[in-house]
Amino acid sequence: MPQLHDSGSRAIQPSDQTHQHDFARIFGIETEYGVSVTDIPEPMDASHVAMTMFQPVVRRARSTNTYVENGSRLYLDVGSHPEYATAEAICPSDALLSDLAGEQTMRSMGLDAQRRLRESDAQNRHATLHLYKNNADSAGHSFGCHENYLVRRFVNLDMIQHVLLPFLITRQIYTGAGRFDGERLLFTQRAAFVDETVSSATTRSRPMINTRDEPHANPDDYRRLHVIIGDSNRSQWATLMKCATTHLVLCMMEHAARSGCETELEAFALADPIAANHAINTDGAHARIALAAGRSTTALELQQMMLEQVESFAAHHGDALEASLRYDALCNVEWIVGQWRWVLDRLAANDIETLSHVVDWASKQVFFNRLQSRGTVTPARLRQLDLDYHDIANGRLYPSLCAHGLMRTLVDADQIHDAVSTPPPHTRAVLRGRFVAAASHTDAVYDCDWTTLKLVRPVHMEAVLLDPFHDEPTKQYDKLMGELGDARADGDEAPV
C-alpha cells in the first residue's frame, strides 16, 4: 500500500541532462471535478459523493491521495473536488491524451459510485451521479484546471508577468469553455473568479499564475510554471492548442532570456490584466484592452500581433522548435501556427458556426441559438444544458455533438483506454508507472511522489527520479524493482 508525501525537489547534484540549450519541455494538466447526485429523496453533500467515489481507492491505497499505474496522481482535493494530475508529458499531444485518460478514470469511478449508491438503499435506486469537468458550480464556487510547463530557470518572473500574461489572457478567445450565468453566455468559466495576476498563494487569492517554487526537477535548472488562468475544456482541439501555443511562446521567452535580448512581445504588456481578463470574459475577441504603452487594442488584434512574432521566430528557429515536438503524433510547428492563424481568421469573420466544431464556447453558443430559434427556452434550461455539456458521467450533450460530427475529436477511444494504464513515453512517468504497477501487486508498503519512489516495508529503500526527461532505469531504480520482485515472489509462495 502506498504512503504519499510531497517533495520540495531541492537538488544537491545536477541532473544528467538539463536541456538548457534546447526547447524540450514537460507538460502537465491538473483538473478538479465538481460532483453532485440527483434523483434521490434527500440532498447529498458533495463531500459525501466524492468520498463515495474514492472508497475503492482508500481500500486499495489506504489514502485518498495516490499515484496510478500510468504515473499520474489521483486525489481528493480540499473540500469535495476529485482531482487528477496527469503524469509528465513530453509534448502537447501526450498531455492531451493523459488529460483524457484522467477523464476516463474519473468517469469510471463516478459510475461505479453511482452503482453502489443505487444498491445501498432502495430509495436511491434512481440516483444519478454528475461529474463536472468545468470550473464553476451553480452556487458560484470556482475550482480549477491548472496547466504546468517546465521552464528554464533563467526565465525570470518579470518576463513571465509582462510577456506571458497578455498571451494567456487573450488566448481565451479560442480556449475559453464558456459559461451561462443566468442571463448570457460568457466566454470563459474562470475569468470572473480570478482576482490577482501573479502570486505564490492560492487559498487567499486566485492568481493567474502561481509562483510557488516547486519545480519537481533540478531547481538550479528549472522552474515549474503553474498556470491557473484557463478553463477545463471538453474540446480536444482546445486542450491541444492551449498547450501547443503556450509552448511556442515559452520557447520565444527562453531564447530571449538565453540570448540576453527581447522577445518582441514586450510591447504587448497590459495596463490592467484583471480588467482585460474581465473584458474578454464578456466581449470575447472584440474586447478592447489597454496596453501599458498607452494605446488600446482588441484581444483578437493582440493575438494576431503575437502570432506574427511567433511566425517570425519560427522562421529563424524552425529546426530547434521541431526538435522539441519530435515525439508529438498530432502536431508540428507548421500545424500549430496554421491552426492558430485559422482560428483567428474565423474569429475575425465572426464565423461562430465553423468555430463551434473546435471551440467550447462557440459550440454552446451555436447549440443555444438553435434551441432559441425553435421557441422559448428558459434560462434555467440553458443553465442545465451548460452543466450537461461538462458532465463526463451522465451528460448527453457533448457526446451527442461528437457522435453527429459537430465537435472535432483528435484521438479515439482505444488510445484513451490504453493511456489509462500506460504512462506517457520518454519521461520519468514510465519509471513511476512501472513501480506503482509492480508495488500494487505486492504486500509492500511504498511511498511515492513526483521525484521519489520509496519502499518502506519489507525493506527501506528509495530511488530518486530528479530528471523528468529521463525514462531509463538507474541502478537505484533497478535495485528497488528487484526488491519488489522478491516481495511479489514471497507473496506468491505464501500459504493460503
UniProtKB/Swiss-Prot annotation:
InterPro entries noted in UniProt: Pup_ligase, Pup_ligase/deamidase
Q: Which residues form the active site?
A: D77
Which GO molecular function annotation, any one, does this entry have?
ATP binding
Residue positions annotated to bind ATP are: R73, T86, W450
- Which residues does the annotation say bind Mg(2+)? E30, Y75, E83
**What pathway is it annotated to?**
Protein degradation; proteasomal Pup-dependent pathway; Protein modification; protein pupylation
* Enzyme Commission (EC) number: 6.3.1.19
UniProt entry keywords in alphabetical sequence: ATP-binding, Ligase, Magnesium, Metal-binding, Nucleotide-binding, Ubl conjugation pathway
GO process annotations (BP): modification-dependent protein catabolic process; proteasomal protein catabolic process; protein pupylation
Record field: catalytic activity:
ATP + [prokaryotic ubiquitin-like protein]-L-glutamate + [protein]-L-lysine = ADP + phosphate + N(6)-([prokaryotic ubiquitin-like protein]-gamma-L-glutamyl)-[protein]-L-lysine
Q: By its UniProt entry, which Pfam families does this protein fall under? A: Pup_ligase (PF03136)
Q: What does this protein do?
A: Catalyzes the covalent attachment of the prokaryotic ubiquitin-like protein modifier Pup to the proteasomal substrate proteins, thereby targeting them for proteasomal degradation. This tagging system is termed pupylation. The ligation reaction involves the side-chain carboxylate of the C-terminal glutamate of Pup and the side-chain amino group of a substrate lysine.
Q: Which family does it belong to?
A: Belongs to the Pup ligase/Pup deamidase family. Pup-conjugating enzyme subfamily.
Record's miscellaneous remark: The reaction mechanism probably proceeds via the activation of Pup by phosphorylation of its C-terminal glutamate, which is then subject to nucleophilic attack by the substrate lysine, resulting in an isopeptide bond and the release of phosphate as a good leaving group.
This protein's name: Pup--protein ligase
Say which species the protein is native to: Bifidobacterium animalis subsp. lactis (strain AD011)
